[in-house]
Structures are given as structure tokens and as C-alpha cells.
């Protein structure tokens, strides 16, 4: 679960970049879910919920050009480095 917090004044740009990443990533092999949410309690903060068929699909996704370009391009827009918390569904 990646969390992104925009620098003041960069919220809209980060929002658009995340929507672009969402659109491309949903086409990646093994993608079950890839949805960006805005945090209602922290303006400018976005949370990404993603699900993959296999862990190897996630690993392949992370090596995709669109992901690497996003990660490199978004750095100047962030107030703090983005964090990722791996989640496992309870069965």
C-alpha cells in the first residue's frame, strides 16, 4: 500500500500523475486491482491499493518502464519520500 504526500502547490500534478500510473498499471499482467484514493483527512495525501495474482506479477510490474518513470518523475512533487506497506488479505 504505497502512500504519497504532495508538497504544497503540487497536489493536482501528483493527482494527475497517479491517475496516469493507475491507467497503465491496470493493464499489467496479473493486476487484480490498482486504485488510487485521496485521503479525506489529509489533503494532498494519496493511497494506492493494489492486488496481484502472484507476487512475481508485482515484481514484474515494479520493473515496467511506466512505473520507473513515475517513481523518478514524482520525487520533486513529494513532501516526503513515499512509503510502501505490504498488505496480506485475511482469509
Model-derived segments and their meaning:
Residues 15-19:
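Short amphipathic alpha-helical segment that frequently serves as the phosphate-/nucleotide-binding helix
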Residues 44-45:
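Conserved catalytic motifs of the protein kinase core domain
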Residues 9-14:
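Short, conserved charged micro-motifs
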Residues 1-4:
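Active-site-flanking beta-strand signature of metal-NTP-handling nucleotidyl enzymes
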Residues 20-32, 51-84:
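An amphipathic, aromatic/His-enriched active-site/gating alpha helix that lines ligand/cofactor pockets
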Residues 37-41:
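Short beta-strand micro-motifs enriched in acidic
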Residues 36, 83-89:
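Hydrophobic/anchoring residues in structured secondary elements
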Amino acid at each position: 500500500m504505497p502512500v504519497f504526500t504532495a508538497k504544497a502547490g503540487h497536489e493536482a500534478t501528483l493527482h494527475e500523475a497517479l491517475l496516469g500510473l493507475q491507467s497503465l498499471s491496470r493493464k499489467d499482467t496479473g493486476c487484480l486491482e490498482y486504485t488510487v484514493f485521496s485521503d479525506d483527512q489529509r489533503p494532498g495525501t494519496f493511497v494506492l491499493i493494489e492486488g496481484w495474482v502472484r507476487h512475481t506479477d508485482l515484481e514484474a510490474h515494479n520493473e515496467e518502464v511506466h512505473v520507473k518513470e513515475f517513481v523518478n518523475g514524482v520525487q520533486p512533487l513529494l513532501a516526503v519520500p513515499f512509503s510502501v506497506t505490504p498488505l496480506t488479505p485475511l482469509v
